[in-house]
A protein has these predicted regions:
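Secreted/periplasmic carbohydrate-active enzymes, especially glycoside hydrolases
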Residues: 1-207, 212-213, 217-220, 242, ...
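Substrate-binding/catalytic cleft of secreted carbohydrate-active enzymes
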Residues: 175, 184-190, 196-334
């Protein structure tokens, strides 16, 4: 929270410095950019789209091949897309490719089926860079994107009851400095409790979480921020910079079904609308499938989701079930 009106360490503060593992990788001078592979499917699960960011860090113009190969869980090739690209020194290009897919196995909470996309750069037939991206084909539908009276959430055309949990990424004595083993332990606890959905309250968690949610079939409501707002040009630009990084790191995950822009939002409507449009530009499925939310306050997104604390911060726990059946509580953030 810094010097803002943010209340409480658990809600808004994030540590500074290095608090997660860091890896140094040596690459070829022409490489796929970090988080530079974007893969998604359309709302009919009939076509797959791939974008690959490649950049030439060398001093000479080079011609390469960009190859994207999708394989099923058994390793059988589904499609292979190839495009020749010429890059001047310092030049970055986004390579856009697409392919139909016939009778795909769909990712869901009961069978979280994952394909694998291998993205490669080839120079003189030699593979000089390669990135592997797990990918699940699925469709989702929210009531706020439909013009009907049905208040249910649909996954692959079937209604799914969302039974989720929020988690603060804090470890006693370690703050946010989770090891991979500690993330895995949290995941096991959440699954053992019977939850099928997760909200990372209220800032982006360790990326290993979404890896597990993809593999375990857990629906993911990812969060960017909580409460904070400064009406300065510097804050606006930095917020949008962090927003783009957040989306880029998470948009390939089939488990992600909600983009949570801010918890108990203090963002002005027009700024939230601007941020929502950035999300939709970076993630086309946010126009047709995924939703963008604030929670317990806020304007400018697809849905301001209510929070209900009956029996905790106040209210009557015996009325909780009845309250959740109300139309304005189809989805509840806490």
């Amino acid at each position: 929270g810094g010097c803002s009106s943010e209340w409480g360490f658990s809600e808004g503060s994030q540590p500074l410095g290095i608090f997660r593992p860091v890896v140094l990788e040596a690459t070829d001078e022409i490489r796929i950019e970090p988080f530079g592979v974007h893969i998604w499917n359309d709302e009919k699960a009939a076509n797959v789209f791939v974008e690959t960011e490649v950049k030439n860090y060398g001093k000479t113009t080079e011609t390469i091949e960009v190859v994207n190969k999708l394989s099923n869980a058994d390793g059988k090739q589904v499609f292979r897309l190839v495009e020749k690209v010429t890059l001047a020194p310092g030049e970055m290009k986004v390579i856009r490719q697409q392919s139909p897919v016939e009778n795909p196995v769909l990712w869901d909470t009961e069978n979280p089926y994952l394909y694998k996309l291998a993205s490669m750069i080839k120079r003189d037939t030699k593979t000089t860079d390669e990135i592997s991206t797990p990918f699940g084909i699925r469709t989702i539908s929210w009531p706020v994107k439909r013009n009907d009276e049905d208040g249910r959430f649909y996954l692959n055309g079937k209604p799914v009851f969302i039974n989720g949990v929020c988690e603060y990424e804090h470890q006693f004595g370690q703050s946010h400095a989770f090891s991979r083993e500690q993330v895995a332990a949290r995941v096991k606890q959440i699954r053992a409790a019977g939850f099928n959905a997760f909200r990372d309250a209220h800032q982006p968690h360790h990326l290993d979480y979404q890896k597990y949610w993809d593999e375990e079939g857990v629906l993911f409501w990812t969060q960017l921020s909580a409460h904070v707002w400064y009406d300065t040009p510097e804050f606006r630009e930095n917020f949008k910079k962090l927003l783009r990084q957040w989306v880029k790191e998470r948009r390939n995950s089939p488990s992600v079904v909600i983009w949570g822009l801010q918890n108990e939002s203090t963002l002005p409507r027009e700024f939230a609308q601007e941020c929502s449009e950035i999300i939709r530009e970076m993630d086309p499925t946010a126009r047709t499938m995924r939703i963008i939310t604030t929670c317990n306050g806020g304007e400018g997104t697809d849905w301001n989701v209510i929070q209900n604390w009956s029996g905790t911060y106040g209210g009557d726990v015996t009325k909780y079930g009845k309250e959740l059946s109300q139309k304005n509580q189809l989805l509840n953030g806490e």
